[in-house]
C-alpha cells in the first residue's frame, strides 16, 4: 500500500468509528437535560463504586453502551447496555443480581429506575482532572497546629470512641463507647467510606465519596474539624505514615477519580505531591481509569501499600524522600479492592475480587508472597485473624458472590506455629453462610466468636441478620441474630441491612449498623460478645443511615 493510501485508510477507519459511535448514541433512549443531571448524581452515589466512573466495570459489570473484548484464545465477545435494552435494565436495577448487586426497588422510585435504565445506555461523560493546584485551592486549614490544644481537654475515653459514618446525611458521628452516647456529630462530606486514626490516636481522618478528607481533633473539650482538603471527585482510602520517626508526618489518599494517589502533610493536610496510576494492567493492556482502592501503612518499613484496582498492581510507596519518590510495583491480579493485615502484620492480604483471588504481599521483602484462589467475589473488609484449632493462624474473607467464608492459613515466625507451615497460603476451611452478600467479617483476640454479615443478600431476613460462629467448634452452624427485630424498630418497606460488626476496645461488645432507608429510622445495635444477648440500641434521630464504624483503639492497632 502506498504512503498516500495509509492516511486515507486511517481517516476512513476513524470516520467509520465516529459514525458507529454516533449511531450507537442515536440509538440510546431520549433523556432531558434535567434527567441526565439527576441520573448522573444517582450513578455517582449508588453505582460508580462497583462499575467505575467510565463504566468499564470492576466488582460490577461493564455498563458501557457497547463494549468488545478479545479473550486469550482470540475469541471476540461483544455486549453493552444498548443490547440489553431499557426493560431488562429496569429489572436488573429493581431486583438486583445473584452476583451481589442489591435490589433498588426499595431505594429508588419506579421513575428513577426507568431514568437510570435509559441513562446507562448513553455514552458516559468524562469528569475533569484534579491537579495539585486544584488540591491547594481546596485546602482549608481551620486551626493551625500551633493554635491547637496541647493536652486532652475532655474526660472521654478516647481509645474507645467509635467514628460512625452517617452515609446519606454526609456526616460523621463520634460515639462514646463507654456510655453509648453520641458525643458529637460533624459535617464530613458525602458518604464517608473509612475513618483512619493518627498513630497517636489524637486525630480521626475521614474520607468520603466526594473526595473530601477531614482531620478531626479529639483533644478539645468538644471534637472539632481542624483541616480539610479535596483529593478529587471520588475516593475511598487514606492512611497516615506510621513508621518510627515518621508518625503522622504524612497522609496519603487514593482517588477513584482522577485515578491517582496524593500525599499531604499529616497534621495540616497541605498538599505536597500527586502521582497518577494510569498505565498498563497485569495483562499488558492500557487502562484509563485504574482506581486506587485500599491503602495501609506498613508496620515494618516507612512505606504505604497502595492497591490499584483495575491494573491489578500493588505499589509500595516509600515516604522517606518525597522529592525522589521510590516505589515498588508488584503484579498480582485484577481487580484489587479491600484487605487487611495477617496475624503477624507482615503480610497484607487484599482481595482481587473480580478474579476470585486474594493476593498476599510480603512487606518485608517487597514481593508477592502468594495468590490464593477463593470463592466468588471475595470482600473481606479488613478481614479477620484468629488461631484455628487445627490449622494455626488464619486470615479470613467473606464473599459477595458465594455463601462461604474462606479461612486462609498464614505464616508465622513464632516457633509454636511452625507445625502449620504446610498449610500456608491455602484455604483450609470454608464456613457455610445462609447466602451470599457478605461485606465484613470480624473477631477480636479476647473473643471466641467470629461475626459475619450479609447485607447485600437479596433476602430480607438474611440481609437484616448477622451470623456468629464459635471458633472453638467451627463444625457448628452459625447462630443467627436478627438485628432488625432486635432493634425494636417498626417494619419498613426498605430492607434494613445489618452491616459491619465492630468490636469495642475491650473486645466484649460488638456494634452492628442497621442501615435503613434515608427516611426510615436507623439504629446501631450493640450485643454482648460473650452471651450474644442484646445490650443496647442507639436510635438517636441523628443516626441516619449508619454504615461503617471504626473504634479508635482497634483501628490504630489494626485489631481485627
Swiss-Prot record:
Binds 1 heme c group covalently per subunit. Binds 1 heme d1 group per subunit. It holds the Pfam family Cytochrome_CBB3. It comes from the Bacteria. Its EC number is 1.7.2.1, 1.7.99.1. Residues 1-26 form the signal peptide. One of its GO terms (cellular component) is periplasmic space. Residues 127-560 are annotated as: D1-heme domain. Residues 27-29 are annotated as: N-terminal tail. Residues 63-78 have a biased composition (Basic and acidic residues). The keyword Translocase does not apply. It is found in: Periplasm. Disulfide bonds: none annotated. Heme d1 binds at residues 193, 236-237, 256, 382, 500. Keywords: Electron transport, Heme, Iron, Metal-binding, Oxidoreductase, Periplasm, Signal, Transport. Induction: By anaerobic conditions. Induced by nitrite, repressed by nitrate, and inhibited by oxygen. Heme c binds at residues 47, 50-51, 97, 101. It is an enzyme of class 1 (oxidoreductase). One of its GO terms (molecular function) is metal ion binding. Residues 61-80 are annotated as: Disordered. Its main location: periplasm. InterPro entries: Cyt_c-like_dom, Cyt_c-like_dom_sf, Cyt_cd1_C_sf, Haem_d1_sf. It catalyses: nitric oxide + Fe(III)-[cytochrome c] + H2O = Fe(II)-[cytochrome c] + nitrite + 2 H(+); A + NH4(+) + H2O = hydroxylamine + AH2 + H(+). Residues 30-126 form the Cytochrome c domain. Homodimer in solution. This is Nitrite reductase. It comes from Stutzerimonas stutzeri (Pseudomonas stutzeri).
